[in-house]
Amino acid sequence: MAEFETIIGLEVHAQLNTESKIFSTSATKFGSPPNSQTNPVCLGLPGALPVLNEFALEKAIMAGLAFGCDITLFTKFDRKNYFYPDLPKGYQISQFDKPICTGGGVTFTIKGEDSARYVRLTRIHLEEDAGKLIHSADPNIPQSYVDLNRAGTPLIEIVSEPDMRSSDEAYYYLNSLKSVLKYIRVSDCNMEEGSLRCDANVSIRPKGSDKFGTRVEIKNLNSFKAVKAAIDYEVEWQKEMALEGKTFQQQTKLWDSVANKTVTMRTKEMSHDYRYFPDPDLPVIVLQKETVESVRSKLPELPNERKNRFVEKLGLPKYDAEVLTAEREVADYFEDALKVSGDAKKTSNWVKDEILGIVNKENITISEFSVSARRIGELVKLIADGKISGKIAKTVFEELLTSDKDAETIVTEKNLIVVRDDKEIERIVDEAIANNQDAVTKYKSGKDRALGAIVGYVMKVSKGKADPELVNQMLLEKLGPLPPKS
């Protein structure tokens, strides 16, 4: 059977989180009543002239710098001409041959792999969003309504080279891209609200060939999982067509998430179908290098840079660093807690396991989490200083969730400080040995897990307050080192 290679390129549209639209002063707030955020410019009324939003331009430059793009110092806007009910002017203001950013790329790592992968970018350009069609849910009333609140919202379109060879690569590419955009705070990347949208261009070719096959563009991809599923389905469909000797036209398809298949929408238009030409209402943009460098100075530490620092400077495992740096707010929370606790690994464990566990379960952001980074740092410091055990820390944490008290106050009020009285601990250890002779026998026969039962007895009697390190030390002195297994 013939073997094929998959070729994938992605086009990502990210709404820029500006207060107003790209060419007018209308607001961009999501969820407002239909057609309540419009003005003559975004309605396409005669005589209404566009004026570029400087903040949108700056955010586009920042995105380009974050992905290592070259910034075009001489750029312009073009009219992309087509008819659709949600496009009141009959054209979209976009960029054709002089995009604001060219080149660059996205670095990502597939889960379970050590080496990073890199996908080149073709360009990033600025454009305005279209409105939104709302179709009647009643099949007996075949009507559609137009909401132009979204029309004119600033977008960047991030176009990749066809460098991806699997749906997994596409999935992790998108995750990395989203992480960077959120880190630099140019977009909230909320797919449910439509502020991040993706189209996938998919083709196949015989392995070893350098000629591209017929390309299919897939739209209506409302999640990264949908992107992965749509690519997998489309690749199998194209392979079947090739093996049966059938051909097909370049076309645009929709992803049907109910039927889990791609459905043909239309034959694909080419760029000449849009009759691009420079927008006569907008002057060309001549950027100064100083302007670009000013934007560069505002760039925060990016996810990969931060991840590497967590591994190299803080000594965290790679997995911990990946979890903590996936979102800027989580990484900030961790570092704020670490400033108080002074113990990177213990702080990492608490943030990624306990705190993110609650955040994910309750479907909230870490900024909405009820316990501040400072209070978590104080709790971890008590553990790191040996004042409380991990088990007691979880009891304290439960109270932190519902109380404004700090960890040390809770520990003091409940008398939870670890017992360091050697004589008292030795008394409990002797009692544990006397009452757990079966475990002692197993330990002396080489079964190291048996020691856990004795330690557990000590912790139970001391109500978790005995110093675990001291308990283990005393047990080893009294029982001797673990003998070799016979």
Swiss-Prot record:
EC number: 6.3.5.-
Catalysed reactions, semicolon-separated: L-glutamyl-tRNA(Gln) + L-glutamine + ATP + H2O = L-glutaminyl-tRNA(Gln) + L-glutamate + ADP + phosphate + H(+); L-aspartyl-tRNA(Asn) + L-glutamine + ATP + H2O = L-asparaginyl-tRNA(Asn) + L-glutamate + ADP + phosphate + 2 H(+)
Statement: the UniProt record of this protein carries the keyword GTP-binding: no
An example Gene Ontology biological process: translation
Class of enzymatic activity (EC top level): ligase
InterPro entries: Asn/Gln-tRNA_amidoTrfase_suB/E, Asn/Gln-tRNA_Trfase_suB/E_cat, Asn/Gln_amidotransferase, Asn/Gln_tRNA_amidoTrase-B-like, GatB, GatB_C_1, GatB_Yqey_C_2, Gln-tRNA_amidoTrfase_suB_CS
Entry superkingdom: Bacteria
Record-linked Pfam families: GatB_N (PF02934), GatB_Yqey (PF02637)
Record's keyword terms, sorted: ATP-binding, Ligase, Nucleotide-binding, Protein biosynthesis
Gene Ontology molecular function: asparaginyl-tRNA synthase (glutamine-hydrolyzing) activity; ATP binding; glutaminyl-tRNA synthase (glutamine-hydrolyzing) activity
Gene3D superfamilies xrefs: 1.10.10.410, GatB domain, N-terminal subdomain
Record's function text: Allows the formation of correctly charged Asn-tRNA(Asn) or Gln-tRNA(Gln) through the transamidation of misacylated Asp-tRNA(Asn) or Glu-tRNA(Gln) in organisms which lack either or both of asparaginyl-tRNA or glutaminyl-tRNA synthetases. The reaction takes place in the presence of glutamine and ATP through an activated phospho-Asp-tRNA(Asn) or phospho-Glu-tRNA(Gln).
Family, as annotated: Belongs to the GatB/GatE family. GatB subfamily.
HAMAP family given in the database record: GatB
Subunit architecture: Heterotrimer of A, B and C subunits.
Protein name: Aspartyl/glutamyl-tRNA(Asn/Gln) amidotransferase subunit B
Organism for this UniProt entry: Leptospira interrogans serogroup Icterohaemorrhagiae serovar Lai (strain 56601)
